[in-house]
Amino acid sequence: MDEDKDIDSKESGEYEDDFEKDLEWLINDKEKSNGSTIEMACKKEDDLDQVLKENETETELGQQLSDPDNSPKDEALPRRNDFISVPSIQPLDPISDSDSENSFQDSKPENQKDLEDEEDEEVRRYIMEKIIEANKLLQTQEPVNDKRERKLKFKDKLVDLEVPPLEDSDTCKALLENETNMSGKLSQLCISGDLEQESVLVSVTDGSCEENDRKILVERDGKFELMNLQDIESQGFLPPISSANSVEHESSQLPLRAPNPSVGGIKKEESEAKGHVLPISPAGEPLAQVPQLLPNPKNRPSSAANPDVTKKARRSNHRIQSAGVSPVTSTYCLSPRQKELQKQLERKREKLKREEEQRKLEEENEKKKENEMVFKAWLQKKREQVIEMRRVQRAKQIEDMSSRQVNRDPQQAFRLWLKKKHEEQMKERKTEELRKQEECLFFLRGTEGRERAFRQWLRRKQIEKIAEQQAVKERARQLRLEARRSKQLQSSLYSIPEAKAFRFTDHYN
């Protein structure tokens, strides 16, 4: 808990430092803006000071040149300021070095004091002017708007969650003491290494008690039962346990007992998962107090570290993955009845699978049959439509032919025939002209041209022959059609019987 408090305090401290840094940044920006104006003012002051110093040095040099007695001062000033190099003028009266040094030292402090006083006055004057200007600016500025939304906002309560310290320190101490007592008593036990079959804790009583009277509390399937030690040993869960005095002598001589074959693997797994035994005295009272959970454990935040969970995770990482997980298909721990049930379930699954496949095949066959029936119906419908269209076209052709025979104009037919003849003659003329042009080119080209012209002539002859045959066929077809039409007309004219033509009918009776 102390570590959690330290972590929370560190996080809150870092959170407060961030806000302090933001405030310092805002303050520094304001100081920089004010400092820039002050730097400009200082630069102006330095420039004025340099100008004043130059003017003073020039006036002093002019006075020294006019007065020959002040020659040592003239030599000292150019060395100190290095503004103007003036040649040294030898005085008329010889003066010793000690006198010149004394006079220079006397004049130096006076000049420095005068310069410092003037600089102080200039600085004061400049500062006063700046103060007056700043006051004027502040008076002219608009008041600050407090309702303006600020970018940097602060919460009333900076820390959202505070973890209270544990108040049950006394209960924790009691739990630790109980654990140490239990570990001390368990260390007195001497049980053989075959403890993986069932997790049983046995309390060793004093040697005065008889072995037959000792009882142990065993948990099975959520129920607690008092059992004798001999019954547990006979079932093979534990090796025989002697008294505390004879354990040290006989522990090396005890043979390891094999588990009872009547106990199946399922019982072992259940005993490993659920078997918890408490040490009981012969009177039936527990020897040691078992640690219990807190009555009202407080809810801790999820960020708090849980050392038990981390330790378990570390331990589990070192184990092999297959050690804790048994294969699903393994049947080594099943009883014969369970194996039979498993086989029945597998048979049911296979049967359902076969039925599902059969049902799918039947559905596919039904769909195929339906598709074939639909296709046949569509094909029959299309055939009927084609037959109907042909019948209608034939009827129209017969009507057109009959109308042409009835309303036939010989002059119009002659004009059509004359037009066709004219078109045929024009085509023949064009072909004749092309042939003549090819023959002219034939005499100019040589042997290659002759062969090509011969091949073209043969092709043209074949085309003409085919055209004549088609014309003969067309003429014969037209003759057959005319003969058929004439027969139809004759049959329609002579179909009325003669008796009906000369019969008298009285329409008034």
Swiss-Prot record:
The keyword Zinc-finger does not apply. Residues 1-122, 237-369 are annotated as: Disordered. GO terms for molecular function: microtubule binding. It is found in: Cytoplasm, Cytoskeleton; Cell projection, Cilium, Flagellum. InterPro entries: CCDC181 (IPR026687). The keyword Iron does not apply. Residues 22-33, 41-56, 70-82, 266-275, 337-369 have a biased composition (Basic and acidic residues). GO terms for cellular component: cytoplasm; manchette; microtubule; sperm flagellum. Predominantly expressed in testis. Expressed at lower level in brain, eye, trachea and lung. Barely expressed in tongue, heart, liver, kidney, spleen and muscle. Present at high level in elongating spermatids, whereas lower levels are observed in round spermatids (at protein level). Keywords: Cell projection, Cilium, Coiled coil, Cytoplasm, Cytoskeleton, Flagellum, Microtubule. Its main location: cytoplasm. Residues 60-69, 319-333 have a biased composition (Polar residues). Residues 335-377, 418-488 form a coiled coil. Microtubule-binding protein that localizes to the microtubular manchette of elongating spermatids. Homodimer. Interacts with HOOK1. Interacts with HOOK2. Interacts with HOOK3. Belongs to the CCDC181 family. This is Coiled-coil domain-containing protein 181. It comes from Mus musculus. The lineage of its organism: Eukaryota, Metazoa, Chordata, Craniata, Vertebrata. The gene is Ccdc181.
